[in-house]
Amino acid sequence: MLQKPEKLDLDRQVLKPLLADGLLYAYQSPEYVKDMGTPERYEMVQRDIRSGLVSARNLSNPQKAVFLDRDGTINKYVGFLRSAEQMELLPQAAQAIRKLNEAGWLVILATNQPVIARGEVSEEELTEIHNKLETLLGKEGAYVDAIYYCPHHPDKGFAGERPEYKIECSCRKPKPGLLFRAAQDYHIDLKKSWMVGDSAADMGAGKAAGCKTAGVYGEKSGDESFATLAEFAAFLCGREKA
């Protein structure tokens, strides 16, 4: 029997029931995804198509990225950060990342987390910390496209350590392994990308990967240096408009 047409809310009435039944699957992608269920959003998507943004974000094309260190670059440095409660953004960090998002840069976190090897933080607890970071960014309209971390540390012989992570690895900055992994996953052109951080290890990783480098908050060994992440974002986005 034919039923009378009725309006449905795609999210609440179709997708959420499928999710509850375990019948909905998804994957994370930095490619262009936009809800265009209103005339205003439809016009925005049309503009993005005409500008070439939709095509440019397709991962079949090489991408440009800004790799960001975490502690002391995005959030306040507190030594070994061990809980989500310690996560606090630096002033203007979210606004800087939002500016990079809006300018079409992939924003990828690349961070050393030896607290895993030290046995002080579990992988699940680190996920909670990063969830808090992403929530704080999201409240300001900003986001990171991916998070890569190194759990290793080469120094051995400490109480509570996890021996499987006490190794010489290729991903602990200043080695470039995290950046290489991201480049493979997201088709990133490293020569057109930047590594930004507050330490010489960040600058070393960026240079080893073939990226341009920018030190912030006092780090001077990069190709460029800026007082804050916000100043870097203004420089990069302003240069593209020039």
Predicted regions: what is each one?
Residues M1-S55:
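Catalytic-core segments of class I nucleotidyltransferases/pyrophosphorylases
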Residues T38, S83, T228-E231:
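Alpha-helix N-cap recognition
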Residues A93, I97-L136, Y143-K156, G206:
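Substrate-recognition element of Asp-dependent hydrolases with the DxDx(T/V) motif
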Residues Q63-V107:
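Active-site neighborhood of HAD-like aspartate-dependent phosphohydrolases
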Residues N75-L90, I116-E124, K139-E140, R162-C171:
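Metal-dependent phosphoesterase signature
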